[in-house]
């Protein structure tokens, strides 16, 4: 990890020297100074800005072939000359930066917090908070109404260096991100075997045993897989079930108590009880034999064949298809009778969607073009796609009377694939207040939100989750170093205990090892930034 960090720093140092060396020379990747003031759209005379971007291989090589950008050019009078990379973006972006021939801005920049702080320190990008106040009324309005986003955008040095992507789909406990590893159960098998939906962890064991031994698919073969998952930090892990035994677990192994204390989840006794429960399933032969080895493709292949009794994923349509054979597994009561759901720390926010470089000579024009992306109707299209495209399937239809967008039926088309062909991405904001006024909510999101509200929200006790705080480079390096070793150790030991047992005899040594990796320092840093975020968002 230290070697990788050093290498990245070296590349960025080279980049900064190249940028400085390029000062005073002709920069063909950026635009000339148009000397514009008091910019209003559309411009009387078309001007060109030069941006670098990343896009999906499914989308056109020239982003200007997208109808969204064609309309935007007409509305603003600004032509964008794109350098568009559809693969290996970070590597190509860094090479361009190191050449010193910078564009006016980098769109969909994909920058880590370390990148942003390095670029700022070396003079590759500029702070933008003054531009927001002076030239960007759409974004400023959002930040005034939602100060928590401004707190998340602000770097430890007090500056804002990048423009965010914001996608609200539900708020607080009712956010679409509150649960990722949703558990799904084969209700056709329940019906075939005359079983009721399980209500407790003990019930689940009995149901899974029946799935194993009762030939619920009726083919006369013992080919059913009672319980399957993909182990790790995805949306297909079983850790969701651990909440039946206490505070539960999530991908970060981090929850925020209602007293504001940041708690680690993978070192307490109820985590141990959760592991022991999954160990029971292993001992009874109920777990997919390939569960700790298979990849996404083999997982969905089994899902499409409907071999699973219980499995985990964000949306069942991705694994077992759009049928009624599977339903949500309700929150299960544990041995104490407790029902609990541990929230994830996911949220619809990313601060790395656009930066303005230090060679940009048209700051007002650039800022106002970016601000146009934060207009509600524009943000919705940039995020999901557009309407009125004669060349391909549309995401929306435009209601001209209300000037709002309505999602069209997908008719079997994969939503992610269609969106990648038409969306623009980049800096945007979609607030919950837009639904029903500016746009309808995507059907798949509405369906999932309804499930979360019905099945999970009543059992969420934690008011807050851990936000995407902006740390100093020093603390980022510390966290990255600790997480790299500690998280690998946590998942390795969990798998060993499930397959081989011995958690009780090894538990104390496990906790000592977590301390050696730096758990106490890790929690102290996390707590410090959580407290700062709470103070700054108000």
Swiss-Prot record:
Taxonomic source organism: Streptococcus pneumoniae serotype 4 (strain ATCC BAA-334 / TIGR4)
Subcellular location: Cell membrane
Protein's membrane topology: Lipid-anchor
SUPFAM superfamilies in alphabetical order: Periplasmic binding protein-like II
Binding-site residues for Ca(2+) 1, renumbered to this chain: 215, 217, 219, 221, 223-224
Family the entry assigns: Belongs to the bacterial solute-binding protein 1 family.
Principal location listed in the UniProt entry: membrane
Lipid attachment in record (N-palmitoyl cysteine): 23
Annotated lipid attachment (S-diacylglycerol cysteine): 23
GO molecular function, one term: metal ion binding
Cellular component, GO, one term: plasma membrane
UniProt effect for mutating residue 384 to A: Significant decrease in fructooligosaccharide (FOS) binding. Impaired growth on nystose
Signal peptide interval: 1-22
TM annotation in the entry: none
The protein's name: Fructooligosaccharide ABC transporter substrate-binding protein FusA
This protein's UniProt keywords: Calcium, Cell membrane, Lipoprotein, Membrane, Metal-binding, Palmitate, Polysaccharide transport, Signal, Sugar transport, Transport
Summary of subunit composition and partner proteins: The complex is composed of two ATP-binding proteins (MsmK), two transmembrane proteins (FusB and FusC) and a solute-binding protein (FusA).
Cited function: Part of the ABC transporter complex FusABC-MsmK involved in short- and long-chain fructooligosaccharide (FOS) import. Required for the utilization of long-chain FOSs. Binds kestose, nystose, fructofuranosyl-nystose and inulin, but not sucrose. Has a preference for long-chain FOSs (tetrasaccharides and larger).
Any one Gene Ontology BP term: polysaccharide transport
Sites where the protein binds Ca(2+) 2: 263-264, 267-268
Record comment regarding domains: The calcium-binding site is essential for the translocation of fructooligosaccharide (FOS) substrates by the transporter.
Record annotation: effect of changing residue 167 to A: Loss of fructooligosaccharide (FOS) binding. No growth on nystose
InterPro entries: Bact_solute-bd_prot1
Binding site for substrate: 167, 235, 314, 318, 353, 384, 419, 423
């Amino acid at each position: 990890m230290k070697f990788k960090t050093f290498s990245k720093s070296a590349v960025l140092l080279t980049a900064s020297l190249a940028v400085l060396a390029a000062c005073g020379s002709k920069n063909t990747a950026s635009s000339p100074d148009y000397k514009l003031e008091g910019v209003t759209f559309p411009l009387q005379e078309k001007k060109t800005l030069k941006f670098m971007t990343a896009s999906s291989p499914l989308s056109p090589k020239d982003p200007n072939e997208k109808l969204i950008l064609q309309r935007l050019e007409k509305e603003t009078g600004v032509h964008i000359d794109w350098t568009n990379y559809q693969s290996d973006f970070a590597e190509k972006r860094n090479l361009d930066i190191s050449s010193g021939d910078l564009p006016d801005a980098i769109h969909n920049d994909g920058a880590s917090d370390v990148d942003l702080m390095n670029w700022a320190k070396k003079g590759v990008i500029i702070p933008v908070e003054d531009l927001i106040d002076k030239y960007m009324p759409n974004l400023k309005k959002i930040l005034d109404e939602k100060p928590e986003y401004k707190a998340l955008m602000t770097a430890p040095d007090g500056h804002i260096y990048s423009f965010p992507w914001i996608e609200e789909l539900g708020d607080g406990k009712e956010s679409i991100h509150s649960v990722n590893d949703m558990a799904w159960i084969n209700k056709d098998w329940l019906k075939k075997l005359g079983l009721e939906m399980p209500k407790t962890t003990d019930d689940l064991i009995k149901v899974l045993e029946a799935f194993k031994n009762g030939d619920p698919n009726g083919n006369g073969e013992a080919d059913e897989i009672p319980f399957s998952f993909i182990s790790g930090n995805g949306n297909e892990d079983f850790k969701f079930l651990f909440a039946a035994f206490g505070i539960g677990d999530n991908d970060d192994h981090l929850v925020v108590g209602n007293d504001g204390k940041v708690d680690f989840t993978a070192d307490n006794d109820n985590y141990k009880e959760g592991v022991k429960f999954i160990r029971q399933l292993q001992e009874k032969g109920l777990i997919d034999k390939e569960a700790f080895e298979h990849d996404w493709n083999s997982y969905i292949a089994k899902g499409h064949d409907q071999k699973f009794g219980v499995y985990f994923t964000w949306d069942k349509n991705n694994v077992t298809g759009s049928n009624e054979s599977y339903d949500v597994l309700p929150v299960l009561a544990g041995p104490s009778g407790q029902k609990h759901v541990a929230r994830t720390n996911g949220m619809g926010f990313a601060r790395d969607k656009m930066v303005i470089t230090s060679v940009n000579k048209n700051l007002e024009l650039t800022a106002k073009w970016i601000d146009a992306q934060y207009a509600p109707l524009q943000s919705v299209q940039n995020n999901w796609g557009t309407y009125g495209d004669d060349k391909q399937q549309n995401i929306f239809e435009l209601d001209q009377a209300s000037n709002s967008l309505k999602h069209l039926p997908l008719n079997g088309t994969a939503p992610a694939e269609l969106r990648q062909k038409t969306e623009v991405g980049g800096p945007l904001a979609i607030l919950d207040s837009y639904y029903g006024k500016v746009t309808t909510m995507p059907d798949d999101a509405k369906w999932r939100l309804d499930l979360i509200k019905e099945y999970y929200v009543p059992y969420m006790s934690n008011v807050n989750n851990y936000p995407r705080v902006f740390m100093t480079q020093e603390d980022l390096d510390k966290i990255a170093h600790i997480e790299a070793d500690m998280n690998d150790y946590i998942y390795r030991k969990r798998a060993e205990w499930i397959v081989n047992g011995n958690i009780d005899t090894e538990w104390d040594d496990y906790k000592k090892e977590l301390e050696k990796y730096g758990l106490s320092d890790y929690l102290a840093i996390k707590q410090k930034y959580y407290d700062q975020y709470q103070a700054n968002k108000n």
